[in-house]
């Protein structure tokens, strides 16, 4: 890769499990990251999960960022399932504060398919084809990655519907 070695050119991952002991899992995760090459470590970011039992933004800040300095990517849809009592704004603030100076934080935005379809059998975690928005960044200069099934078409439609964003 010819991109600079920074979280701006990130490799985004989830911890994704806890094996009945979050503290021990976080420790093993951080130790594994420490064994990676600097080129990889400098690009890694970690994202909150979409299950209540897994990793929320505040848990990632405390267990990963505060230990090894890895930036946290805030995923707005995932936050709905693992909010730990925080509003979206509060979780976004926590995640943004983990990013190094001079690097624009990345956030993920998607909407549940159920929001756009009247099919109760669809999981609330399934991404919709498009997003209606608006996407709230609460004044932060962040890069928003839209996660939608229609990919680039979803981004183009959003930009047409929200030209000031």
Report the location of each language-model feature.
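A general structural signal for well-ordered alpha-helical packing
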Residues: 57-61, 77, 89-92
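Active-site-proximal loop/turn and secondary-structure-junction residues that shape catalytic pockets
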Residues: 15-19, 48-52, 76-80, 111-113, ...
């Amino acid at each position: 890769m010819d991109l600079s070695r920074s979280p701006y050119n990130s490799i985004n991952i989830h911890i994704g499990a806890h094996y009945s002991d979050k503290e021990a899992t976080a420790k093993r995760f951080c130790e594994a990251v420490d064994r990676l090459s600097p080129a990889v470590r400098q690009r890694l970011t970690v994202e909150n999960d979409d299950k209540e039992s897994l990793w929320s933004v505040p848990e990632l800040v405390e267990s990963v960022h505060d230990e090894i300095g890895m930036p946290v990517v805030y995923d707005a849809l995932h936050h709905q399932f693992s909010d730990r009592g925080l509003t979206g704004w509060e979780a976004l603030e926590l995640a943004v504060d983990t990013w190094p100076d001079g690097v624009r934080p990345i956030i993920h935005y998607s909407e549940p398919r159920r929001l756009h379809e009247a099919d109760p059998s669809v999981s609330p975690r399934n991404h919709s084809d498009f997003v209606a928005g608006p996407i709230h960044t609460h004044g932060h200069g962040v890069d928003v990655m839209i996660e939608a099934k229609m990919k680039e078409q979803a981004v183009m439609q959003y930009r047409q519907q929200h030209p000031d964003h």
